[in-house]
């Protein structure tokens, strides 16, 4: 009985020490919005609760396509919606987006790749944007 317990303990240690290491192969896929909040001097807005959506697909060839929708966030209180088209790259655990034709926070902040998740947290001109996307 003792050899089995020792084997299980060793397996648990190995499993716990095997941290996720982002690669192109394991971050490629389709991501959808889990969390999206902006915080400024007037408070925090939860865009998921307001009906906001975001999707983004990372292809193995470094291209990306997606969609961002924020109800009431456009000019004059109109809805804001845009297609996210461009390229993506991975360096360490950081994903960056190159979307020359699309001026959004998506291209302007670094994204952290963890297992089945992309997270961004950055402050622009006093407004903090926190986004989590999951596969």
Language model features by range: what are they?
Residues 1-15:
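Sec-dependent bacterial lipoprotein signal peptides
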Residues 94-135:
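Beta-sheet ligand-binding and adhesion/scaffold domains
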Residues 37-40, 68-74, 99-101, 122-124:
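Short acidic, glycine-rich loop/turn motifs
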Residues 17-32:
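N-terminal helix-cap/turn-to-beta initiation motif at the start of protein domains
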Residues 3, 26-27, 94, 117:
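N-terminal cationic leader/targeting segments used for protein routing and processing
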Residues 45-94, 124:
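N-terminal glycine/threonine-rich, aromatic-flanked beta-hairpin/loop signature
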């Amino acid at each position: 009985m003792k050899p089995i317990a020792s084997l299980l303990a060793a397996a648990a240690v190995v499993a716990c020490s095997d941290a996720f290491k982002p690669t192109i192969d394991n971050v490629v896929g389709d991501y959808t919005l889990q969390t999206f909040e902006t915080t400024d001097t007037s408070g925090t807005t939860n865009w998921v609760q307001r009906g906001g959506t975001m999707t983004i697909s990372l292809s193995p060839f470094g291209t990306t396509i997606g969609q961002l929708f924020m109800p009431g966030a456009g000019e004059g209180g109109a809805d804001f919606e845009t297609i996210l088209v461009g390229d993506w790259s991975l360096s360490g655990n950081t994903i960056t987006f190159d979307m020359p034709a699309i001026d959004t926070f998506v291209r302007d902040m670094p994204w952290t790749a963890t297992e089945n998740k992309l997270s961004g947290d950055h402050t622009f001109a006093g407004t903090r944007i926190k986004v989590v996307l999951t596969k």
